[in-house]
Amino acid sequence: MSESAFKDCFLTDVSADTRLFHFLARDYIVQEGQQPSWLFYLTRGRARLYATLANGRVSLIDFFAAPCFIGEIELIDKDHEPRAVQAIEECWCLALPMKHYRPLLLNDTLFLRKLCVTLSHKNYRNIVSLTQNQSFPLVNRLAAFILLSQEGDLYHEKHTQAAEYLGVSYRHLLYVLAQFIHDGLLIKSKKGYLIKNRKQLSGLALEMDPENKFSGMMQ
């Protein structure tokens, strides 16, 4: 806890009730449709947010990277339908019991202020992502997406979900993936695609982010 900024998010000392959780890659930090019992603070690792749509399709919504809260919307709104949060890689989270701390945290001005800043940053990042989807070619967006979602240099997202997230056709996605293989950026394997040239992929991704504001998400 001393190595993170977690304790600085609250006016009250929450050390006694803070727990440490460890999640392996592909473990679920939050199960869809189940109210989380804990307010998580991701201190290390990356995770993805999923939602099941009315037609039964599973849609990839967003990515999280440490440090950030997970479950803060459910803390504020008890009626909010929880979405699935899955670890992309090994994740470590500090956590507070949601039920016990909800009344206290909803009256903690420091926590609420930090939460407002966090949510505004998420909203800004989503706006930037939408703008990038409209303004940059798929080679740049797919490079960033691969770096966001890769697990130990292995990219294995479902093509249907990736195409939907990037707002392109399935065929267009496969065409650019084949181009990356031809250019030596990726190697096709049985489990997915191995990243062969991270530097070149990062260069393509950072063309959309010259100020490196989101480069921490792509470690």
Curated annotation (Swiss-Prot):
Cofactor: [4Fe-4S] cluster
Residues of the DNA-binding region: 158-181
Region (Sensory domain) location: 19-97
CDD domains on file: CAP_ED
Chain sites annotated for binding [4Fe-4S] cluster: C68, C91, C93, C116
Residues in HTH crp-type domain copies: 136-199
One example of a Gene Ontology biological process annotation: DNA-templated transcription
Gene Ontology cellular-component terms listed: cytosol
PROSITE patterns with a match to the protein in the record: CNMP_BINDING_3, HTH_CRP_2
Gene3D superfamilies xrefs: Jelly Rolls
Cofactor binding mode and count: Binds 1 [4Fe-4S] cluster per subunit.
UniProt main location, coarse: cytoplasm
Database matches in Pfam families: cNMP_binding (PF00027)
Gene Ontology MF annotations: 4 iron, 4 sulfur cluster binding; DNA binding; DNA-binding transcription factor activity; metal ion binding
Residue span of region Dimer interface: 111-131
Keywords linked to the UniProt accession: 4Fe-4S, Activator, Cytoplasm, DNA-binding, Iron, Iron-sulfur, Metal-binding, Repressor, Transcription, Transcription regulation
Induction: In the stationary phase, aerobic expression is positively autoregulated and significantly dependent on RpoS and Lrp. Its transcription is directly or indirectly repressed by FNR.
Localisation: Cytoplasm
Subunit structure: Homodimer.
Function description: Transcription regulator involved in mid-term, stationary-phase viability under nitrogen starvation. Might control expression of the salvage pathways or in some other way repress the recycling of nucleobases to nucleic acids and enhance their use as general nitrogen sources during nitrogen-limited growth.
NCBIfam families cross-referenced by the UniProt entry: PRK10402.1
Any further remark recorded for this protein: Its activity might be modulated by a sensory iron-sulfur cluster, by reversible dithiol-disulfide formation, or by both mechanisms. It is not an oxygen-responsive regulator.
Protein name: Regulatory protein YeiL
Organism: Escherichia coli (strain K12)
